């Protein structure tokens, strides 16, 4: 293994830069040349590939976003398009590709490994949604969680001052981990998740019970994958006469300097990805399970159609929100 490339793809997440830094410095330490692919898979097509040096990743571990940039590239699903991307790697003698991103990014890496046996591919889970199989946590999840906690703590101040119910919508299309972990952390009165069939009438009854006990305000945490915050508010007011406000946190969840936990996770996974390439591994995603570094074949990651839902944590959140 003499040359590798690294790219970031899909939605950005805090800690991607730390992962690129770890890949780059681990490779250089092992006398491997590193190339950065700018603009994700689109950069592979456009030949936007440039050599990275130690200085290229200096002063990046604390930066949010990705200095390699990211872009959606739906045309990468086409075989002719992928051939062009593979040729751009081949002509530089690149033997390994590290892809940092989510499920769609992994699928692109798998295609490359299938269609070009001389190019090894390793995926690193980078998404705030924490929805990738093969790992307990994805890069960016912890930072996004802390961003939500900080925001909702401030929202609760104004909710308390005006005796209002705030519906807070957070990211999470298919996986409600952000809503679940944040809801437990901020003491939300109710958490609405895509993994759980929630009757809004029950939510209204719970809020009403709290009002009867003297509670003046409530926080309802909603993952975007099951309904919008506004839809939740509209449904609630059909059953109970309360003053509601909706707060959609949106892309603020993706930004900001990565937390210490995300910097460490990204560094560990980035270094491990290079080690796997050195060992001749390919078509695998790296991860962390029980604080141990692991690797899982892409086929197995895709076969697990549903991540294991933490029902125990959900039940605890319900018990603590009485």
From Swiss-Prot:
Binding residue positions for ATP: 11, 72-73, 102-105
Residues bound to Mg(2+): 103
Residues forming the catalytic site: 129
The protein's name: ATP-dependent 6-phosphofructokinase
Organism, as annotated: Staphylococcus epidermidis (strain ATCC 12228 / FDA PCI 1200)
Gene (name only): pfkA
EC numbers, comma separated: 2.7.1.11
Residues engaged in binding substrate: 127-129, 164, 171-173, 224, 245, 251-254
BP GO annotations: canonical glycolysis; fructose 1,6-bisphosphate metabolic process; fructose 6-phosphate metabolic process
Keywords: Allosteric enzyme, ATP-binding, Cytoplasm, Glycolysis, Kinase, Magnesium, Metal-binding, Nucleotide-binding, Transferase
Keyword Cytoplasm tagged: yes
Cofactors, names only: Mg(2+)
Annotated residues for binding of ADP: 21-25, 156, 187-189, 213, 215-217
Enzyme class label: transferase
Transmembrane segment boundaries: none
Pathways involved: Carbohydrate degradation; glycolysis; D-glyceraldehyde 3-phosphate and glycerone phosphate from D-glucose: step 3/4
């Amino acid at each position: 293994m003499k040359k590798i490339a690294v790219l970031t793809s899909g939605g950005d997440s805090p800690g991607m830069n730390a992962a690129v830094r770890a890949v780059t410095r681990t490779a250089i330490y092992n006398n491997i040349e590193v190339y950065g692919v700018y603009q994700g898979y689109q950069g592979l097509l456009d030949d936007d590939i440039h050599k990275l040096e130690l200085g290229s990743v200096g002063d990046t571990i604390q930066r949010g976003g990705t200095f390699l940039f990211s872009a959606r590239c739906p045309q990468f699903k086409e075989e002719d398009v992928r051939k062009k991307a593979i040729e751009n790697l081949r002509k530089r003698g690149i033997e390994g590709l590290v892809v940092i991103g989510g499920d769609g990014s992994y699928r692109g890496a798998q295609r490359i490994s299938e269609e070009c046996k001389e190019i090894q591919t390793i995926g690193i889970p980078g998404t705030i949604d924490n929805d990738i199989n093969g790992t307990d946590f994805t890069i960016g999840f912890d930072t996004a969680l802390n961003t939500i906690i900080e925001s909702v703590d401030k929202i609760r101040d104004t909710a308390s001052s005006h005796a209002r119910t705030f519906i807070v919508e957070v990211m999470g299309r298919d996986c409600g981990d952000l809503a679940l972990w944040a809801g437990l952390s901020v003491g939300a009165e109710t958490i609405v998740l895509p993994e759980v069939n929630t009757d809004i009438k029950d939510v209204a009854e719970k809020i009403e019970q709290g009002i009867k006990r003297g509670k003046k305000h409530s926080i309802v945490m909603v993952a975007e994958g099951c309904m919008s915050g506004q839809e939740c508010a509209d449904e609630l007011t059909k059953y109970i006469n309360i003053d509601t406000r909706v707060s959609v946190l949106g892309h603020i969840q993706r930004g900001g300097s990565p937390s210490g936990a995300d910097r460490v996770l990204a560094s560990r996974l980035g270094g491990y990805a290079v080690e796997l390439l050195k060992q001749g591994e390919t078509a695998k995603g790296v991860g962390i399970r029980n604080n141990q570094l692991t690797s899982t074949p892409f086929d197995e990651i895709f076969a697990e159609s549903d991540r294991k839902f933490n029902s125990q944590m959900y039940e605890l959140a319900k018990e603590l929100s009485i």
